Amino acid sequence: MKTEYLLQREVDLVLSALTETNRLVMRTALHTGLRVGDVLQLQPWQLRPHFWVTEDKTGKRRQVGLPEPLLSDLRNHAGEYWVFPGRNPRKHHTRQAVWKDVKRAAAAFRIPQNVAPHSFRKVYAVELMKKYGDIEKVRRALNHNSESVTLIYALADQQLQAKYRRRRASSGRKAS
């Protein structure tokens, strides 16, 4: 089952219920559009306002930027080897730990969508689409090869609204 887009209030609820470390991981993912695995592989030497990341999934390089408040939080959190150290400081925090915490937080608030860390990447894409209205800019920001894949992300809010309208229509309630 694919992960789904979250409304801003749902993002805020999920973030509020995460552990401090996982909240910082997800704030970073939300601001940069990076996949959680790439966020977890950040090393302290990379923490600058703009830096390059090689994406684990694709092997492609991309530049990301961080605003000062987030950059400061990341620097304060960073260990010697990793920005997000694991129990063994020579290894980074795990994707599985973040995934479980995001799932737990979403369930605690009874959020009906299939929420996972990747949902935050869709939120990032939708926000970029709203800001720029340019699918090519969103495609480049996500480092996608295909515009059609980017459209799935960038229009995820509209897909969610349509899903709710269909659900309301089938239950006999008036769609708004």
Task: Give the label of every model feature segment.
Residues 67-112:
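Active-site/catalytic core of tyrosine-dependent DNA strand-transfer enzymes
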Residues 8, 20, 32, 41-72, ...:
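Conserved tyrosine-mediated DNA breakage-rejoining catalytic core shared by Y-recombinases
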Residues 120, 124:
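Active-site His/Glu-centered metal-binding helix of metallohydrolases
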